Amino acid sequence: MNVARFLVEKHTLHVIIDFILSKVSNQQSNLAQHQRVYTGEKPYKCNEWGKALSGKSSLFYHQAIHGVGKLCKCNDCHKVFSNATTIANHWRIHNEDRSYKCNKCGKIFRHRSYLAVYQRTHTGEKPYKYHDCGKVFSQASSYAKHRRIHTGEKPHKCDDCGKVLTSRSHLIRHQRIHTGQKSYKCLKCGKVFSLWALHAEHQKIHF
């Protein structure tokens, strides 16, 4: 391939990627960090190790690694975490712009997509329709879960006994059989249950 042509095509690809990211991401900081991939700029430096990084989030995650096995503390809200992964996930709360507001009730979301899904609770819109039975859903995840009823697909497998289930929520509920976890407590008598259905059935004795 001609070198000049290759460079032009590579540059064009970068321009396209930048354009897509500018449309998908409403955070200028994300785009700026992405562009540093090409410039090689690393303006954020770890004071402990001297490592230079291209973005604030990368620096934060790197610094959190120093705290593995210790208590990692968030510099913004002083909340503490036990490991690097959880503190890095938490930090996104501070790093993302909560700028999407529902014009019906005022509830605020960090992502436009979350707002769009939430607004369907007001509009009643259900854009996902299953062709075999005609049932409609407001969320893609609910549609996918229902589809498995028809297809028989069970992608979630229990590591303890090998049982396969249609959804992650069903898997979590099933795993309580093995762990003995009982998350549902009766406020009247203090009795605890592993399943909501058992908890709900128990409640009837108090009424």
Curated annotation (Swiss-Prot):
Its main location: nucleus. It is found in: Nucleus. Keywords: DNA-binding, Metal-binding, Nucleus, Repeat, Transcription, Transcription regulation, Zinc, Zinc-finger. GO terms for molecular function: DNA-binding transcription factor activity, RNA polymerase II-specific; RNA polymerase II cis-regulatory region sequence-specific DNA binding; zinc ion binding. May be involved in transcriptional regulation. It comes from the Eukaryota. Belongs to the krueppel C2H2-type zinc-finger protein family. One of its GO terms (cellular component) is nucleus. One of its GO terms (biological process) is regulation of transcription by RNA polymerase II. A zinc finger (C2H2-type) spans 72-94, 100-122, 128-150, 156-178, 184-206. This is Putative zinc finger protein 137. The keyword Transcription applies. Pfam families: zf-C2H2. InterPro entries: Krueppel_C2H2_ZnFinger (IPR050826), Znf_C2H2_sf (IPR036236), Znf_C2H2_type (IPR013087).
